[in-house]
């Protein structure tokens, strides 16, 4: 029997043909869809999800024919950008990104600025007249490639950019089997899954100069559901600086002040993507020398309260029907809202930051992830307190009752994960907060952004329903209060909560 041909599993993301999310993964699907919508998206192609298992089954090598297909797509990127991958002048740099069918923010690996060498760094410096930018871009690539592909941040990347690309593709495929992916898929009952795709995209540079930056925006507030643009950005930075939480970003209001034209484009982009998704849109963007580029989009992770309000508002706006609105709220989210607690007055505030994951809970502050896992396994309610969270912290986050960080913003991966699983989260509390809180019992209010000394909670389960919950029950054809729900219904936790 002849072996299958895999050359057709490397696909252009040019928006000219519809693609299946299961085949190309969520990231590539969004790139292709946004190209179809004529948004400013850098050129890209994808190695489809079946290649992930094929790569593993082939002993960590790409199947026959795949590399030739990759080179053919690289030639298309070169033509689109007017640059040459590994070329002696006007070098093309690319990002190599993961993307499973189900969104798993930050769980798998990404390599940025790929295609650089010390010689090409100098070419970039001469071409741009900005030696500092070229050096920063090289340093970012060298460290990132060493950490992700070579498992040694001090190791030098291969001298040939094509060898760099082979290595990065393999590293992204291999990241499908890492511990944080397993923990995430187990927590969300996603099963084994079909593997990750690999998206190769032409680089744009938020770290280039004063007219550059990077950020994340949501078409609505993912914590409250309020119908207003929410997001953060960092000038002269690349995307990982925002989502990793290693820096505390600025609100979009400062972008509106400095670059009003770019901000206006983002407002329209959010409307366009939300209308296409018919859901809360989470959009990653880069500004390169005054030009806006959209890198990816997806349905945004949201808090329980936001899930209810967004579902109701989208139904009222005619973007979704009542049945879809009801299906957008999970049993776990309903339980979170039904058990909401409060905070007693006159309790000492021991830390203040940005409330990034609504909810109130109490636990023992622990700064070491291994100790946090051990204490949680023994039955202790753990509040994970960290300078910032890395993807490796995800298993400890899942076993904690809240997360508090020194650095980071509301669009960091820590905030996204916490909102998705209903975990109270406060970010950006200031340097030294995690050390200061370690070992103390604290109450975390992820709505207000405050951390209190000791157990400051009051009893949960207030008698009245939030008006958006009442509206959701009405969309479901149910009356608030009364005998309305089968115990197995996702909205059953609201059954004992009536109107005043």
Can you name each region flagged by the protein language model?
Residues 1-338, 342-345, 380-383, 388-401, ...:
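Nucleotide/phosphate-binding sheet-loop regions of phosphoryl- and nucleotidyl-transfer enzymes
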Residues 352-383:
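Phosphate-handling DNA/RNA-contact segment within nucleic-acid enzymes
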